[in-house]
């Protein structure tokens, strides 16, 4: 029989689901005492090369309030050609096409190995993919040139029938006509005036006179084919023209006097982009790709004035309510994000500058629409160029690894309700019997819209057990959840992916050991971290840390083995032993610690809310590898005791790859030993972490910042700030101390944290 660890991994590979608990407490009261909520990390479009889509539509439950999809957990009467829904127990007739089914001739959706299945929907018109570039021209000459080259390169990666458009902005905003042969023509808008969607569409000539009964008909893509084709053209038609147009783009002509910032109308440019797509291609897969090299400095959405002597807001300003433009700008971008999400479009933000660019205010544009957020120093760096190129990578079938306009519908058995979701989604406000009144994350609904998805996009979905304590579930009972994802595939097909899972119920009084053994501490750490980061958006940082600490203490009290008032007796089983360590590193992470970070570090939170379990764990607790002459590279503790003079360290934090040379290694390299034939093994030692780093850099999206440093180097701070400070300037000379690098910090170490946790867990006062 498979261990729980193997069971968890098999389910993740097959269904893209990781639950915090894999045996569920059978009553509401007991579930609340488990501290960590019943929740899962769902990767709706997890890549499955072994899962070809079926070319027919799913069979749905006939009950209007259910509509669950036929799945392997349903009971089937093959003689009567009936099936019973495992969610509402409605008996349903099979459609005529299923007349030949039997125990030995089952459709794929009834086979146990197809707990996840994908359907291709044949009906409905297919729409091309749409890419609308929104380009900042207030860049330095070399930055603008590099960006133009990247955009020209991207045209060759788009499908020939994809529609593409171009908006440029500086002090003014220009919407470029692409249907003109031989001449450049554009519509120019003032960057200071906020325009409604109707005004934008009227000015661009996208509306046509109202006709009787016109309002009753839902908008269809390409309702005004001529009007929209002036601004959005198939790549194969305008490849050469647009390449030339991009090549001719000049820096914003308005002069910038000394001591001033360029006037940058980002808010108006985005508003026009949203209005253009809203009027021409509602409910069609589209990406608005914003490239900006500085903060918006005029018009709606501005985050700082043009006077350089007045700095952009800091966390200190925000705490003191001294960020003059922040609330108004955030409101503007939230309004745009909600409109974009309602139309099924997504907004990507590519912000490359040495100073802040206003990501704090603009973050909702990417967060609510499932768009990408990329932050760099310059468009002329390999970090941006390679990250941008990776957006257009293809899967094993030659299709883009991106999907559009998805809706996620979650169905549960009667003992469960849905509390909410955390991830790149917006609520569709679909109430129903399976929706909980207690919200966690984006709640009050059983359906969410995810406008931009890729194979690693992951949502945290939280549930509530509602079965009462006095109505026991029969022995061997199982709870079920179904995830139904409707989306537009990058091949323009409409598809539905259905994942149906079940887990055993258990009585906590008699089967607590089973529940404990089925605890997934990695998934639980990420799910609790997402809750903490979600709360940090609206609560004070210290309050969030206190909440996380309280939850950790309660969990240790519930599942630890100890004698009252005796910290030395405290033990956690293997299922829980790593969880406190994850919480320790989470408390020190940039997701919760804003000190010494700029407000644009909301970039980190953006990625944490959308990455899968493996990448999220790396963000919480970076991986550290050690290279030495004594053997192959090995993972070592993320601890200052691992920093040794004769070692090379490779640290992966997800956002950075750091190679650190110990003191002796750095001296040998300076002496040039690697160039001497007799020290070839030293040359290989220096090369090994570089090769491994290259492998990570090639696979990661977005591409991490690459840092090569050594003992005493200024960039060694990236490593020193992450390791557990077991050796500091305060305890450096403690008796029996291992050799290692002391960290100059007053932060508590993991050992002190654990000692304090044990004291509180065994205390009867807590």
UniProtKB/Swiss-Prot annotation:
S-S bridge residues: none
Superkingdom field: Eukaryota
Which keywords does UniProt give here? Answer: Acetylation, Cytoplasm, Cytoplasmic vesicle, Endoplasmic reticulum, ER-Golgi transport, Membrane, Metal-binding, Protein transport, Transport, Zinc
User: What CDD domains does this protein's entry cite?
Assistant: Sec23-like, Sec23_C
The record lists Zn(2+) as bound by: 61, 66, 85, 88
Q: According to the UniProt entry, which residues carry N-acetylalanine?
A: 2
Topology in the lipid bilayer is annotated as: Peripheral membrane protein
Q: Where in the cell is it found?
A: Cytoplasmic vesicle, COPII-coated vesicle membrane; Endoplasmic reticulum membrane; Cytoplasm, Cytosol
What molecular function terms (GO) are annotated for this protein?
GTPase activator activity; zinc ion binding
The primary site where this protein sits is: membrane
Keyword check for Transport: yes
Which Gene Ontology cellular component terms are annotated?
A: COPII vesicle coat; cytosol; endoplasmic reticulum; endoplasmic reticulum exit site; endoplasmic reticulum membrane
The segments carrying the Gelsolin-like repeats are 633-719
**Which residues does this entry mark as bearing N6-acetyllysine?**
564
Quaternary arrangement and interactors, per the entry?
COPII is composed of at least five proteins: the Sec23/24 complex, the Sec13/31 complex and Sar1. Interacts with SAR1A.
In its UniProt entry, what is this protein called? Protein transport protein Sec23B
Q: Which organism is it from?
A: Pongo abelii (Sumatran orangutan)
């Amino acid at each position: 029989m498979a261990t729980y660890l193997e069971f968890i991994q098999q389910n993740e590979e097959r269904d893209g689901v990781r639950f915090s608990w894999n045996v569920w407490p059978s009553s509401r009261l007991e579930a609340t005492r488990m501290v960590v909520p019943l929740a899962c990390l769902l990767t709706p479009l997890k890549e499955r090369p072994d899962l070809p889509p079926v070319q027919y539509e799913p069979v749905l439950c006939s009950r209007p309030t259910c509509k669950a999809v036929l799945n392997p957990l349903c009971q089937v009467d093959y003689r009567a050609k009936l099936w019973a829904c495992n969610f509402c127990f409605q008996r349903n007739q099979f459609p005529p096409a299923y007349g030949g089914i039997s125990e030995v001739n089952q459709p794929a959706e009834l086979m146990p190995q197809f707990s996840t299945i994908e359907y291709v929907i044949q009906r409905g018109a297919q729409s091309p993919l749409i890419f609308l570039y929104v380009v900042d021209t207030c860049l330095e000459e070399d930055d603008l040139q590099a960006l133009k080259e990247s955009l020209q390169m991207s045209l060759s990666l788009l499908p020939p029938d994809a529609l593409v458009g171009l908006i440029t902005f500086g002090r003014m905003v220009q919407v470029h006509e692409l249907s003109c042969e031989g001449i450049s023509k554009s519509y120019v808008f003032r960057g200071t005036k906020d325009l409604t969607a109707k005004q934008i569409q009227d000015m661009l000539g996208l509306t046509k006179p109202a006709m009787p009964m016109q309002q009753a008909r839902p908008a269809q893509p390409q309702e005004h084919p001529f009007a929209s084709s002036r601004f959005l053209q198939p790549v194969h038609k305008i490849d050469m023209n647009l390449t030339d147009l991009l090549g001719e783009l000049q820096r914003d002509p308005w002069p910038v006097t000394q001591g001033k910032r360029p006037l940058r109308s980002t808010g108006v440019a985005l508003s026009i982009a949203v209005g253009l797509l809203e009027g021409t291609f509602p409910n069609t897969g589209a990406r608005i790709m914003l490239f900006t090299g500085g903060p918006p400095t005029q018009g709606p959405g501005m985050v700082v004035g043009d006077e350089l002597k007045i700095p952009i807001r800091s966390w200190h300003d925000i705490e003191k309510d001294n960020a003059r433009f922040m609330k108004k700008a955030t409101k503007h971008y939230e309004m745009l994000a909600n409109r974009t999400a309602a139309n099924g479009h997504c907004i990507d933000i590519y912000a490359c500058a040495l100073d802040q660019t206003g990501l704090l205010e603009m973050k909702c544009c990417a967060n609510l629409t499932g768009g990408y957020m990329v932050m760099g120093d310059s468009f002329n760096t390999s970090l941006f160029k390679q990250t941008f190129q990776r957006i257009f990578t293809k899967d094993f079938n030659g299709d883009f690894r991106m999907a559009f306009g998805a809706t996620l519908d979650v169905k549960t058995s009667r003992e469960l309700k849905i509390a909410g979701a955390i991830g790149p989604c917006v609520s569709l406000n679909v109430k129903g019997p399976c929706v909980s009144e207690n919200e966690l994350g984006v709640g009050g609904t059983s359906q969410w819209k995810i406008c931009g998805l890729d194979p690693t996009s992951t949502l945290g979905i939280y549930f509530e057990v509602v079965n009462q304590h006095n109505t026991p579930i029969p022995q061997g009972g199982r709870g079920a959840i179904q995830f139904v994802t409707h989306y537009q595939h990058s091949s323009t097909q409409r598809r539905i992916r259905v994942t149906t899972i079940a887990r055993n119920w258990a009585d906590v009084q008699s089967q607590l050991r089973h529940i404990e053994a089925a605890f997934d501490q990695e998934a639980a750490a990420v799910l609790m971290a997402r809750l903490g980061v979600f709360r940090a958006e609206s609560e004070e940082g210290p309050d969030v840390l206190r909440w996380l600490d309280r939850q950790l203490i309660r969990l240790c009290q519930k599942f630890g083995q100890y004698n009252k008032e005796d910290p030395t007796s405290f033990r956690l089983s293997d299922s829980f032993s790593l969880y406190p360590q994850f919480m320790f590193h989470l408390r020190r992470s940039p997701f919760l610690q804003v000190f010494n970070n700029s407000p644009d570090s909301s970039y980190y939170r953006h990625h944490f809310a959308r990455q899968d379990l493996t990448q999220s764990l790396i963000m919480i607790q970076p991986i550290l590898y050690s290279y030495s002459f004594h053997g192959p590279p090995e993972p070592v503790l993320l601890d200052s005791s691992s920093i040794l003079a004769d070692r090379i360290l490779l640290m992966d934090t997800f956002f950075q790859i750091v190679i650190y040379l110990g003191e002796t290694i750095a001296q040998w390299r300076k002496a040039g030993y690697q160039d001497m034939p007799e020290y070839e093994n030293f040359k290989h030692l220096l090369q090994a972490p570089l090769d491994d780093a290259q492998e990570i850099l090639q696979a990661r999206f977005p591409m991490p910042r690459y840092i090569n440093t050594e003992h005493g180097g200024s960039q060694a701070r990236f490593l020193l700030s992450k390791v557990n400070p077991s050796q500091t300037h305060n305890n450096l000379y403690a008796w029996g101390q291992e050799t290692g690098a002391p960290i100059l910090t007053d932060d508590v170490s993991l050992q002190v944290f654990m000692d304090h946790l044990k004291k509180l867990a065994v205390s009867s006062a807590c």
